[in-house]
Amino acid sequence: MRTHFCGLVDETLIGQTVTLAGWTDVARNLGGVCFIDLRDHEGIVQVTVEPVAGDDASAELFKVAASLGYEDVLQVEGVVRARHAVNDKLRSGKVEVIATRISILNKAAPLPFHAHENPGEETRLKYRYLDLRRPEMQRMQRTRIKLVQALRRHLDARDFQDIETPILTKATPEGARDFLVPARMHPGEFYALPQSPQLFKQILMVAGFDRYYQIARCFRDEALRADRQLEFTQLDMEFAFVRERDVQDFVEDMIRAIFKEVVDVDLAAQFPRMTWAEAMRRFGSDKPDLRIALELVDVAELVKASQFPVFTAAANDADGRVAALRIPGGASLSRKQIDEYAAHAAKYGAKGLAYIKLSETGEVSSPIAKFFSEESFAALLKHVGAGNGDIVFFGAGGYTKVSDFMGALRLKAGKEFDLIADGWAPLWVTDFPMFEWDEEAQRYVALHHPFTAPAVDDIADLRANARTAVSRGYDMVLNGNEIGGGSIRIHRPDMQSAVFELLGIGAEEARAKFGFLLDALNYGAPPHGGIAFGIDRIAALMAGTESIRDVIPFPKTTGAQDLMTDAPSPIAADQLAEVHVQVRPKQV
């Protein structure tokens, strides 16, 4: 139906006859001439219709051109010629196509929005097929496509084996809630959609495949936000006979090469590294954005002798923290704006937010100054590096909570005070805690997942020091986004059973849920490790968008709905009966 793509018509084709197909982006009838911007996935070319006096065929052609509306689907035949007025905004802007034939392949109904408009997100998702026609959306989807293609080429060239793992699998506790699928042939029993291929890729290592990868679809029934979807795509990788640096060095080289190939970005020749403890201490986050030149400063030793009980209680608590965040130029904040910072901190667990504000002339404004002697107050300001025109926020309380809300303030200040440097800031975060204590459940939970190996090989040591145990987990972070997470796995069945026990999973429950894994580990499992990268998140970073929904062709809303297909939707009673499911009436 076509000989060339619209966006690729150029000067080399001048004088030649071409056949094009695409959508009417714009049609302009100027009386004596019609101009049609014809669009396909490669771009736009101008089609010109010039009636010839006394020529019935050209008059009919002009009539067809004058009748065109937005997004009508056309096939156009014509001759390429040089344009009198060059359009530098188009790749085809030096030429035009003089139409000799126009066929309307399909008329478009009146549009809810035009391809060059950007309506609200609900409208975009309801008419996703129209939204995806927009040049910006085409660009972002192409970025994702190029990313996946480049990853496959890179790994295929290095003898990684692309192996599919099941979509219908066993429900196992991996952190988030499972999506369940009733098993028609086994009444009362269910499959689960995989949250990740974690256990299957480990079993592939036991099976001797050595180097595995998969562009895997994953499913987690959890609350949605700009960087999270119910179903998502990850590059899943696993290596046999490796230590942490073997995995890290390989994938660091891979990510560096992929960014260069896909978006022509040169990432650092060597990614910086820091432990989880250092990241939390300096930045209040296990995925710090190093483009923001602000750091938290511990001030517990300087406030122990103050008369401010909130500070002294935390400073004298072994599990407490008093941290300061200096914001250059922050003295410009009004009282209302300071309250907004306090409210933001409260979302992350802060019960209050103290501050010291220094005017450009050095005048102090602070609700806590009265609790310090003149000497100790001056020492505090010196320690945090405060100067005229700055504001210093203080957080006090439990170490983790203070780190969390002060880290959130750091990000907010970085954005609002334009303190985020241009460029790309990758890093490795390593040595994560093995466990964290869940107050509500009154037990340990795995910080990464239950299959991450501890840094110690001795089970007695792990049991005795579970609270402070360090794992062999690692994350790759880019501009404040965790783009990849992995670990060295447990390959000994006795260690895996011990970790289950520490997580409150008894031997009987472990056998019921993970018996297949424990059995596999008993038959000569090699040391192994791996990592998974979020394709959606990396594509969003490459495309320059904050929402992964922009790089997913058919995403869900934050309300977990597909507005285009109207999913989820009710199921007929006979279909439910076939899978032995009865739906309880909604509670009014």
Swiss-Prot record:
Keywords: Aminoacyl-tRNA synthetase, ATP-binding, Cytoplasm, Ligase, Nucleotide-binding, Protein biosynthesis. Catalyzes the attachment of L-aspartate to tRNA(Asp) in a two-step reaction: L-aspartate is first activated by ATP to form Asp-AMP and then transferred to the acceptor end of tRNA(Asp). It comes from the Bacteria. The keyword Iron-sulfur does not apply. Homodimer. One of its GO terms (molecular function) is ATP binding. One of its GO terms (biological process) is aspartyl-tRNA aminoacylation. The lineage of its organism: Bacteria, Pseudomonadati, Pseudomonadota, Gammaproteobacteria, Lysobacterales. Residues 198-201 are annotated as: Aspartate. L-aspartate binds at E174, R220, H448, R489. Belongs to the class-II aminoacyl-tRNA synthetase family. Type 1 subfamily. It comes from Xanthomonas axonopodis pv. citri (strain 306). NCBIfam families: aspS_bact (TIGR00459), PRK00476.1 (NF001750). It catalyses: tRNA(Asp) + L-aspartate + ATP = L-aspartyl-tRNA(Asp) + AMP + diphosphate. It is found in: Cytoplasm. Gene3D superfamilies: Bira Bifunctional Protein, Domain 2 (3.30.930.10), GAD-like domain (3.30.1360.30), Nucleic acid-binding proteins (2.40.50.140). Its main location: cytoplasm. InterPro entries: Aa-tRNA-synt_II, aa-tRNA-synth_II, aa-tRNA-synth_II/BPL/LPL, Asp-tRNA-ligase_1, Asp-tRNA-ligase_1_N, Asp/Asn-tRNA-synth_IIb, AspRS_core, GAD-like_sf. This is Aspartate--tRNA ligase. The keyword Cytoplasm applies. ATP binds at R220, D221, E222, Q229, E482, G534, I535, D536, R537.
